[in-house]
Amino acid sequence: MGKTAFIFPGQGAQKAGMGKDFYEKYDTAKDVFDSAGEWLDLDMKALCFEENDRLDLTEYTQAALVTTCLAMEKVVEEMGLHPDVTAGLSLGEYCAIEAAGGMELKDAVTTVRKRGILMEQAVPAGKGSMAAVMGMETEKIEEVLADIADVSIANYNCPGQIVITGLAEAVAEASEKLKAAGGRRVIPLNVSGPFHSAMLATAGKELGKVLEGVTLHELKIPYVTNVTAEYVEDPAETKALLEKQISSSVRWQQSVENMIRQGVDIFIEIGPGRTLAGFMRKIDRNVKVYNIQTVEDAEKVCQELV
C-alpha cells in the first residue's frame, strides 16, 4: 500500500461561501468555526460564508482560510480518512502542522491571525510586489534574477510556474528581462506585499516572538516544511522554520517530489480551490490527486478510500 498526504492551499484560495456546507452538516466543523470566532473576536460565519470586503485582506484572509481548511480536515478524519504525512503551501503549512498533531487548533488560528497582521504591516503598501513567471526553466529564471538586486524567487510551484517577489521596481525590471529572455508570460499578482522576500525578515522576527508563546507537541505524523522541502519529525524545529518561512522561498515542487520519493501516491487537497491539484498534474501525473472543497467531495473521496 502506498501512502497518503493531506495538502493545504495558501493565501489566494479563499472564496466567499467556503466551508459553509461543512458548518451546516457537521458539528465538528461548526465547533471549529465557532471556536475560532470566539478566540479572535471575529464573526467567522460572516467572514467566510458571505460576500464581504474583508476576506481578501491579509489580516483576515489567513485566519479565515486556516479555520476553513482545518474544519474540513477534521470532518475528513472523522469519516475515517487519515494521512501519513501533511504539507501546506505557505500559510497552509500551519494547517499541515496542526493536522500532524504539532499544534493546537487555537494556537494555529490565533498565530496566523497575528501573522497576517505582521505581514500586512511589514512593508508599506505598493512598495513591494510579486509576479508569476510561466513557461520558463527555473535555472534560466535564477540566472536572470542573479543580476538584479531586491528580487528573488517566492515560490517554486511546479514546472513552468515560478513566482518572484521583492521591491516593486525590481520585480518590474525582472519581469521585463524575463520576458525578453523567453518567459512565455509574466503575470503581476494581486497581493498586498512582497511575500516570501527578504523584505519580510523583520516580520519573521516578530512572528518568532509570537511563536515563543505557543506550545508545540510531539508530531503524530511528519509534515514537510516549505523552507527545505524536508520531512519534519522533531517539533523543536518548527518555530525556527515558521519564522524563516515568511521571508524564504516556498519549495512546493521539491516538497511534493520528496513525498513521492518517500512512497506517497495519494494526495488529498483540502480547502477551497484546486490550485494544488493543478500543480500536481504538472509535477507528476502518475499519482492520484483528490480535491475536497465541499461536503459532497469529502463524502465521495472517503467512500472511495476508507
Regions found by a protein language model. Give the residues of each.
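Alpha/beta catalytic cores of group-transfer enzymes, especially the acyltransferase/condensing modules
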Residues: 11-13, 40, 100-247
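Cys-dependent protein tyrosine phosphatase-like superfamily
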Residues: 1-2, 213, 217-231, 237, ...
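FabD-like malonyl-/acyl-CoA
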Residues: 2-140, 185, 266-296
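Short, flexible helix/strand-to-coil boundary loops that buttress conserved ligand/catalytic motifs
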Residues: 48, 145, 175, 280, ...
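Non-catalytic positions within long, well-ordered alpha-helices that form the structural scaffold/packing
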Residues: 77, 179, 260-261
